[in-house]
Swiss-Prot record:
Molecular function in Gene Ontology: GTP binding; GTPase activity; metal ion binding
Biological source species: Shewanella denitrificans (strain OS217 / ATCC BAA-1090 / DSM 15013)
Gene name per UniProt: mnmE
Binding positions for (6S)-5-formyl-5,6,7,8-tetrahydrofolate per the UniProt entry: 22, 79, 119, 453
Domain TrmE-type G per the UniProt entry, residue ranges: 215-376
Keyword Ubl conjugation: no
GO terms under biological process: tRNA methylation; tRNA wobble uridine modification
SUPFAM superfamilies reported for this sequence: P-loop containing nucleoside triphosphate hydrolases, TrmE connector domain
Subunit comment: Homodimer. Heterotetramer of two MnmE and two MnmG subunits.
Keyword line: Cytoplasm, GTP-binding, Hydrolase, Magnesium, Metal-binding, Nucleotide-binding, Potassium, tRNA processing
Protein name (Swiss-Prot/TrEMBL): tRNA modification GTPase MnmE
Binding residues annotated for Mg(2+), in chain numbering: 229, 250
InterPro entries named in the record: G_TrmE, GTP-bd, GTP-bd_TrmE_N, GTPase_MnmE, MnmE_dom2, MnmE_helical, P-loop_NTPase, Small_GTP-bd
Binding site for K(+): 225, 244, 246, 249
GO annotation, cellular component aspect: cytosol
Amino acid sequence: MTTDTIVAQATAPGRGGVGIIRISGDLATNVAMAVLGKVPKTRYADYCDFKDADDRVIDQGIALFFKGPNSFTGEDVLELQGHGGQIVLDMLIKRVMQVSGVRIAKPGEFSEQAFLNDKLDLTQAEAIADLIDATSEQAAKSALQSLQGEFSKEVHELVEQVTNLRLYVEAAIDFPDEEVDFLSDGKIANALYRIIAKLDTVQDSAKQGSIIREGMKVVIAGRPNAGKSSLLNALAGKESAIVTEIAGTTRDVLREHIHLDGMPLHIIDTAGLRDTLDTVEKIGIERAWAEIATADRVLFMVDGTTTDAVDPHDIWPDFIDRLPTRLGVTVVRNKADLTGESLEKSQEQGFDVYRISAKTGLGVEELKQHLKSLMGYQSNLEGGFIARRRHLEALELAASHLQLGKEQLEVYLAGELLAEELRMAQMALSEITGKFTSDDLLGKIFSSFCIGK
C-alpha cells in the first residue's frame, strides 16, 4: 500500500465555473498549512485565500478537510474548490506539489486507496467509473445500485454459503469413519443445489447488468433475401446496408451502434445463410456463424411470403439446432405489408414472434420496444446492479467449479475433491469484490479510471 500523498484535479479539464483540486494522504495537513495558512475545521466549508510560496493569492475559494479514516479514501483528504479556469487550477496544483512528498495521482488512484483502505470493495470502486461513463438513466441507476453495494451483497451471500458448506465438508473429512454418512445423507447435496440455484440467479442478473453497461449484441440472421439488411437500416434509421432483390447481396458482416432511450445496442447484419459454391459468400457465412456464437440475441429473420409457419423449428430446424445453448432467439416475420398479417406479438414454443415490414416500418417500433425490454430497460428506473465482463467470467468459473463439485459428490462421494472445488469457487467469487485479487488485475481496473477519481 502506498504511503504517498497524492494530488489531482477532480473536475473535468477545461474552462468551468468551479474547479476542484483533491489531495489525499498524511501530508494533506501540511498542504493546508502551506496553501491556506491553517487546517480547516473537519467537514466545514471554509472560505479562504489560496496562496503561493511568496504569500501571494493565487485564487479564492472553499476549502474542505476530511480527517481519515472518515473520508472517501480513508486518509486525510483536503479539497480546494476554486474558479474553474485551467491556468488557475494548474498554478494551484504546482503550488501543492511544492510541499515535499506530494506527487500527481495516477488514474483511479483515489478510488484505489479507498479500496485498499476498505472504504469500498472492488465492485463499488468500479461502479464509480461506470456511473461517470453511464450513457443512459438506466445505466446510471444500475451503477448507483452497485456503488451502494447491491451486487456486493449478492456475491457476499454466495461466498458465505460456499464457505459454510466447505467447512461442513471438511469437518466430515476429519472424521473418516463417518465421512460417507455425512456425504450421503442429503444435507450437503441439498445445500450445494441451493447454492447452484442462487448462483444461476445472480448470473442472470449480472448478464443483464453487463448488457446495461456495455450494450446488447444483436445478430440479424436468416436465409438470403429475408430482409435482414432492410431491418438493419430500419433500426439504424439510415441506409447503412445495400438492399437489392438479388439474393446474397450482403457478403460481409455489417455493424451499427445505436441507442434506444440511451441504452447501447450493437446490431450485426450478416450474410444470408445457405449452401453455396461462391468462395466469397462462404467466407461471409462463416463470419455470420462466428458473430452468432458471441451474440446476446439473434433476430431470426423470416420472409413471411415464403411460409406460414411461426415455430422456428418448423421454419428451419437445422438453423435452430445449430444455435448455441441458452442463446435467446426472437422470430421476426418480415413483409407483413404483403402478407397482411396482424402485427400483434405472439409466443410460439417459447419464442417471441414479431410481424413487421422492414420496408415500410410497420411493427419496427414494437420490435425496438422488445429489444429495450431485453436490455433491462425499465421506465421506473428501479433496475438492478451494473456488471462487467470480468464479473461474468468469475461467476462462470465459480459455476463450473460447483458443477464439478456436484459430480464429485453424486458420482464418487469424494469429500476432499468436493472441498477443493468449493475452495476454488470461493476464490473465484471473492475475486469479484477484491477479497482475493492479483495486483495486475487491480492495476488494470484502476488505470481505466479518470485522474482525480
